[in-house]
């Protein structure tokens, strides 16, 4: 059993018990199966993209989407990507998260939407009369047992959102633009392994710092040039910098050709051109998403923001989720999963 698996005690109700060190990343089950760390991160991100796209079709609240993503990352602390395809685990995480977060959806609806997203075709027929329906249904019910084991029946998830709202209220008087950018940044962070390396409070602090500089807001600093608000909030400067660097790295791996998009101050959405958004005092970070509210539904062109309704075939998510937009037979989908997992 790997060092990482040992580091997560059964039944832990403490978020910190799910946090590992960077050194332990080389001992994940996937790494021990020969999957390079950068490829593991990309496959994790693909699974999170799948969660978001299916979740938006189901009109799930934001907390349910975030919880599903965290379950997904925790699952692969105990099991390998080589043995469990990220689409299948992602679908199961959605199913469990909807129950835990009191956002229950019918298994039938989850199955149908998972099949449609996996095949990249909203019009494909999936119902109880198709093999694809029963294949996905069986996969979700089977994998749920494995997921429960992986989580040690510890369903409690602490999110960064309350922390960032506290920072915003205390230090910038509930500035709406800061809130939008910080909220979106946290959403994007769920696609990375940040939740495995840093506490929710640290992730929230990174989102707040990024939002401050994105909106050109300068708060007071110490004689050493460090933000006073971090000191008052008892947040580590180095850890915040680590989160920013990690998210930046993920953006570059997923879509190296694109950088941060500027916020359109008129409507709060991102423009289509490239613009810098680097927190100069900390690290270079790219972000590409639109701030959202908890009960919105939709999707943007790269990372998840909940402000549109239907997926676009020209998006980065589309490139990640599938290699074809035509309907596939069940056997074709199985073959695609086997190819992606290898």
UniProtKB/Swiss-Prot annotation:
SMART domains: CYCLIN. Gene3D superfamilies: Cyclin-like (1.10.472.10). InterPro entries: Cyclin-like_dom, Cyclin-like_sf, Cyclin/Ssn8, Cyclin_C-dom, Cyclin_N. The modification Phosphothreonine is found at residue 300. Transmembrane segments: none annotated. Pfam families: Cyclin_C, Cyclin_N. The modification Phosphoserine is found at residue 302. Residues 278-314 have a biased composition (Polar residues). GO terms for cellular component: cyclin-dependent protein kinase holoenzyme complex; cyclin/CDK positive transcription elongation factor complex; cytosol; nucleus; P-TEFb complex. GO terms for biological process: cell division; positive regulation of DNA-templated transcription, elongation; positive regulation of transcription by RNA polymerase II; signaling. The keyword Nucleus applies. CDD domains: CYCLIN_SpCG1C-like_rpt1 (cd20545), CYCLIN_SpCG1C_ScCTK2-like_rpt2 (cd20546). One of its GO terms (molecular function) is cyclin-dependent protein serine/threonine kinase activator activity. Residues 329-342 have a biased composition (Basic and acidic residues). It comes from the Eukaryota. It is found in: Nucleus. Keywords: Cell cycle, Cell division, Cyclin, Nucleus, Phosphoprotein. Residues 261-342 are annotated as: Disordered. Interacts with cdc2 protein kinase and with the N-terminal domain of cdk9. PANTHER family: CYCLIN. Belongs to the cyclin family. Cyclin C subfamily. Essential for progression through the whole cell cycle. This is Cyclin pch1. It comes from Schizosaccharomyces pombe (strain 972 / ATCC 24843) (Fission yeast). The gene is pch1.
């Amino acid at each position: 059993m790997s060092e990482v698996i040992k580091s997560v005690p059964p039944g832990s109700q403490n978020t910190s018990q799910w946090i590992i060190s960077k050194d332990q990343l080389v001992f994940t089950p996937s790494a021990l199966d020969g999957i390079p760390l950068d490829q593991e991160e990309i496959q994790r991100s693909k699974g999170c993209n799948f969660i978001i796209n299916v979740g938006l079709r189901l009109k799930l609240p934001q907390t349910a989407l975030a919880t599903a993503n965290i379950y997904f990352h925790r699952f692969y602390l105990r099991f390998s990507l080589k043995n469990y395809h990220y689409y299948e685990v992602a679908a199961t995480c959605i199913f469990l998260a909807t129950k835990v977060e009191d956002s229950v959806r019918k298994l039938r609806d989850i199955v149908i939407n998972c099949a449609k997203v996996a095949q990249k075709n909203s019009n494909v027929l999936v119902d109880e009369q198709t093999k694809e329906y029963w294949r996905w249904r069986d996969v979700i019910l089977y994998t749920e047992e494995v997921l429960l084991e992986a989580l040690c029946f510890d369903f409690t998830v602490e999110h960064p959102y309350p922390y960032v709202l506290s920072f915003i209220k205390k230090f910038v008087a509930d500035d709406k633009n800061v809130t939008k950018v910080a909220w979106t940044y946290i959403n994007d962070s769920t696609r990375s392994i940040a939740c495995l390396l840093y506490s929710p409070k640290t992730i929230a602090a990174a989102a707040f710092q990024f939002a401050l500089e994105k909106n050109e807001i300068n708060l007071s600093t110490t004689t050493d040039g460090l933000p006073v608000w971090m000191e008052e909030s008892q947040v580590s400067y180095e850890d915040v910098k680590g989160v920013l660097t990690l998210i930046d790295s993920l953006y570059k791996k997923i879509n190296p050709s694109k950088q941060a998009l500027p916020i359109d101050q008129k409507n709060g959405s991102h423009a289509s051109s490239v613009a810098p958004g680097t927190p100069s005092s900390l690290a270079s970070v790219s972000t590409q998403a639109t701030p959202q509210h908890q009960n919105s539904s939709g999707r943007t062109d790269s990372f998840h923001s909940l402000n549109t309704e239907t997926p676009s075939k020209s998006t980065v998510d589309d490139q990640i989720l599938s290699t074809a937009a035509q309907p596939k037979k069940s056997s074709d989908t199985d073959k695609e999963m086997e190819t992606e997992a290898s």
